Structures are given as structure tokens and as C-alpha cells.
Swiss-Prot record:
The keyword Glycoprotein does not apply. This is Basic immunoglobulin-like variable motif-containing protein. Keywords: Cytoplasm, Nucleus. It comes from Mus musculus (Mouse). It is found in: Cytoplasm; Nucleus. It comes from the Eukaryota. One of its GO terms (cellular component) is cytoplasm. Its main location: cytoplasm. Signal peptide: none annotated. Belongs to the BIVM family. Residues 1-32, 438-460 are annotated as: Disordered. Residues 12-26 have a biased composition (Basic and acidic residues).
């Protein structure tokens, strides 16, 4: 082995570039060892100021102790070769076919991949290597305190699998519930319990004349059914136009509508206006528990069900006859009895809600919309003379009329319906029947006959402002036939008044 001075000269950077080309490989290999010592001694072992160790060596972590093992290629960037003892031969370090080229001026020798097995292996520990070659930075102990949190999480990861899985299932259930809540909207249920078609309110003829609540309510229903203000396609009509169609003459303020306006009168006026505009419709009593034309077999719950369904139907309109007044139901609300059911999911039973009926008012002396309990309306309709209940003044309670008549009640709910079926034209009827009807104008059973023109003298017509035109009598036979056909097809036979009074 060459001495230290020769090795120092051989490895000196200033002279390494002028190394003789005919130097033997053994001498070159031996000269690489001091070079390694020099580079190793100059390499900083202690960590840098930032607390990190040199990045040229790979780091391997274990649970007990963390080492950084420098492999045989760890210092290739420093171009050094490592060997265990100086007695290694060329055949041990280099393969037979390995030789230095004549033009190679570098001072470093390439080492095959099998050199690591010769330098150190699993049987040679780090202590033997350090005693033979001095203290080398091949391995050092690293402070692993900064990795404790990570290793702790890794250690307990397998133990928390079930807990994490249960948490995931819980979160999935919450997420599914939230998605269902997002898809579900209480608006649909609220719309079923709170119904108010603003078009019905738009069509309320307000204000009315002094006693024209009947014709004002009728025009409100007709405009909703047939005009563009409601569900139809015709121009809306006014009270004055309707009164002119019915034969009344101004001044309308002087007409006393009360004595000749009844339930069947409104039905007949409805048919006359329909005939004038060539539209189809029918009318019938929805609920009248007492008196003439009462709806036998109809119950309050059944009437409520029909009324609420009809208020959702744009082909139906209603008039409520109360104490000395007519006005139009336009909506309702089914209020839950319990507070926690305000936005309940799904429909509620009739026992869980209380119904309020919204009623449009034509008189300017009262609120535009009344809101009355259905129970109070039922009480009003079920009272009989001389007892009565004024639905617009519930604070007065049950009252008694000064009358000798006992029993019966005129109060009721009347329905008006727009029909889509086509009635037979004039040419479809057998002319002999029409001629016979015109020659023998008899009262046909099933036709409502209330305070009609047939029962009112010409003198009374003049006093009431009624225009008793000849066209009314000319059209009477046709109207009788049309009314018969209309009632037979619609199936409503509930509003007969044989006494001619309502």
C-alpha cells in the first residue's frame, strides 16, 4: 500500500488531472480510498441550521430506530469508490473485461453492482465497518419526534376502522336525509291546504248597487267562468250590461232587487245570460239542509269536500246565500289544529284541520274578503225560522226573526258550472215539438219557477223598472226546451220550487 504522502499526492486535485495513463488499476483503486476519507471528513455530519440532514443519502424509517443507510451508489454525485480492505484485488472489484481507457483522464473508477456485497452485507454491521475504515457518516440516528404524530395515526388507523365506518354510515344517512329534504318541498302540501285563485277575487263586482247583491254575485261568477278575467275567453261584462240583457232599464239605483231576487231567480238569470252569449252552463244547489229545494242526503262533510274540490276547479263558481245577502266563496284554508303540523309532510285528516272559507264581498261597506269558519257556515245553514245566524255579524250570535212562520231556511250554497259539451242546435230539434210547445205554453215539470216574469204583473214590472219586452215571450218556448235538455244532460234535478217562492 502506498504511504500517506503518496496517496495525498495521487489524490490531490491539482495533480489528479495529470495522472499517467500507464498507471495500474490497482494503484488507481488504492488511491480512491484516501479521496473518500477526505470527502467524508469534509462532509458535515451534524444537521444544518434548518434541522434537516444532508439530502444526498436516502432515509429509511423503522418503528424502533430510523437509519439513513448509504448504499454503494450514494456518493456517486461525489464520484468516490468505497472498498472494505486494501487487499482487494482487481478481480474482486472489477470484472475481467473492465479496463481503463487510454483517454480517460478522470480519477474515479466505476464499480459494478456486486461491489456492495463485497464492501458490506447483512452480516457486516456498521460497527465493524467503522472500526476498519474509521468513523464514517454511513449511518446516523435521526430524531423522529416530529414523526410521532404521523406514526401514532398510522398505528391506530387499523383500530379505528370500525369507528370510521360507523361514522361514514351516519354521515351517509345524514347526507341522504338532507338530499331528501332538498327534493321535498312543503309548498305542495301547503298549496293543497291554502287555496285562493286570485282570478276569482279579480272578478268580484265591487261595489254593488244598494240591493243588487244577487246580480252582482252572479256577474262575478259568470266573469270567472267565461271571461278573460277568469278562466274563459270572452270580454268581461258589467252589472249594467247584464241588467240590460235581462231587460232592466236605468236608473238601476232605483230598482228594489230584494223582493224578486231569490235562489232560483239567480239560476234563471244565469241561463239567460248564457243563452245571450251562446255559451253552455248549468246551476244547482250544492248544500241546503232545510227548506224548499233542500239537498236531501247531503251532509256537511260531503258538502265541504265538494266545495273545496270545486274551488280548485276553474269550471265551477259558487254563491253563498246568507242573511239578506249574496256573496261568492273564492277560496279556503285548512288550518292544522296542532302547531307542529303547520308544515307537516303529507296530507292531514279532516280531524287534524279546521276549515276556513274565504268569501269575496261585493258591498263596499264590508271587508273585501271575509274569512269564516266552515262550522259557522254549517250553523247558519242549519238554523230554522224563527232562529237565524248572521254570518257577517257573528258577534251578535243566534237571533230570532219576528215572524209567525216556523221552520225552513232560505240560506244555501249555489253552484254554477261551465260546460264543454255542445248542445243541439236549433236544426236538430223536431220542429213539431217546438211548434206544439209554442202553441201550448204549459209549465214543464222540473223547471224552476221562482219570482219569474210570469208571476209578476205588468204594473209590477213598471214599478220595479223591468222592461217587459216582447222578445222575452217569443223566446220562452225555446228557453224551456233548452233548459229541459240542459238539465237532462247535466243530471241535476234538485232545484224544483213548486210553490214559486224561495
Amino acid at each position: 500500500m502506498p504511504n500517506a504522502t503518496e496517496a495525498g499526492k495521487a489524490t490531490d486535485p491539482g495533480h489528479g488531472e495529470h495522472t499517467s495513463e500507464n498507471k495500474s488499476p490497482e494503484e488507481g483503486l488504492q488511491g480512491a480510498v484516501p479521496s473518500f476519507y477526505t470527502s467524508a471528513s469534509e462532509a458535515p455530519i451534524a444537521p444544518r441550521g434548518d434541522g434537516h440532514y444532508p439530502s444526498s443519502c436516502p432515509v429509511t424509517h423503522t418503528r424502533e430506530k430510523i437509519y439513513a443507510i448509504c448504499s454503494d451508489y450514494a456518493f456517486l454525485n461525489q464520484a468516490t469508490s468505497v472498498y472494505k480492505t486494501p487487499s482487494l484485488t482487481r478481480s474482486a472489484c472489477l470484472p475481467d473485461n473492465t479496463s481503463l481507457s487510454a483517454g480517460n483522464t478522470t480519477r474515479y473508477i466505476g464499480i459494478s453492482t456486486s461491489t456492495s456485497e463485497i464492501i458490506y452485507n447483512e452480516e457486516n454491521n456498521l460497527e465493524n465497518l467503522s472500526t476498519g475504515m474509521g468513523k464514517l457518516p454511513l449511518a446516523w440516528e435521526i430524531d423522529k419526534s416530529e414523526f410521532d404524530g404521523v406514526t401514532t395515526n398510522l398505528i391506530h388507523k387499523s383500530g379505528n376502522v370500525k369507528k370510521q365506518f360507523s361514522k361514514k354510515k351516519t354521515s351517509d344517512k345524514k347526507g341522504r336525509h338532507q338530499r331528501e329534504c332538498l327534493h321535498y318541498s312543503p309548498l305542495d302540501d301547503v298549496k293543497q291546504r291554502k287555496v285562493l285563485d286570485l282570478r276569482r277575487w279579480y272578478c268580484i263586482s265591487r261595489p254593488q248597487y244598494k240591493t243588487s247583491c244577487g246580480i252582482s254575485s252572479l256577474i262575478s261568477c259568470w266573469n270567472f267562468l267565461y271571461s278573460i278575467m277568469g278562466a274563459g275567453n270572452l270580454p268581461p261584462i258589467t252589472q249594467e250590461e247584464a241588467l240590460h240583457i235581462l231587460g232592466f232599464q236605468p236608473p238601476f239605483e232605483d230598482i228594489r232587487f230584494g223582493p224578486f231576487t231569490g235562489n232560483t231567480t239567480l239560476m234563471r238569470w244565469f241561463r239567460q245570460i248564457n243563452d245571450h252569449f251562446h255559451v253552455k252552463g248549468c246551476s244547482y244547489v250544492l248544500y241546503k239542509p232545510h227548506g224548499k229545494n233542500k239537498t236531501a242526503g247531503e251532509t256537511a262533510p260531503g258538502a265541504l269536500s265538494k266545495l273545496t274540490r270545486g274551488l280548485k276547479d276553474e269550471s265551477l263558481a259558487y254563491i253563498y246565500h246568507c242573511q239578506n245577502h249574496y256573496f261568492c266563496p273564492i277560496g279556503f284554508e285548512a288550518t292544522p289544529v296542532k302547531a307542529n303540523k303547520a308544515f307537516s309532510r303529507g296530507p292531514l285528516s279532516s280531524q287534524e284541520v279546521e276549515y276556513w272559507i274565504l268569501i269575496g264581498e261585493s258591498s263596499r261597506k264590508h271587508p273585501a274578503i271575509h274569512c269564516k269558519r266552515w262550522a259557522d257556515i254549517v250553523t247558519d245553514l242549519n238554523t230554522q225560522n224563527p232562529e237565524f245566524l248572521d254570518i257577517r255579524h257573528l258577534e251578535r250570535g243566534l237571533q230570532f226573526r219576528k215572524t209567525k212562520k216556523v221552520g225552513g231556511n232560505l240560506h244555501c250554497i249555489i253552484a254554477f258550472q261551465r260546460l264543454s259539451w255542445q248542445r243541439f242546435g236549433f236544426w236538430n230539434f223536431p220542429f213539431g215539438t217546438i211548434t206544439q210547445e209554442s202553441q201550448h205554453p204549459t209549465h214543464v215539470p222540473g223547471i224552476a219557477k221562482s219570482e219569474s216574469e210570469d208571476n209578476i204583473s205588468k204594473k209590477q214590472h213598471g214599478r220595479l223598472g223591468r222592461s217587459f219586452s216582447a222578445s222575452f215571450h217569443q223566446d220562452s218556448a225555446w228557453k224551456n226546451m233548452s233548459s229541459i235538455h240542459e238539465r237532462r244532460n247535466s243530471g241535476y234535478h234538485s232545484f224544483r220550487d213548486y210553490n214559486g217562492n224561495d
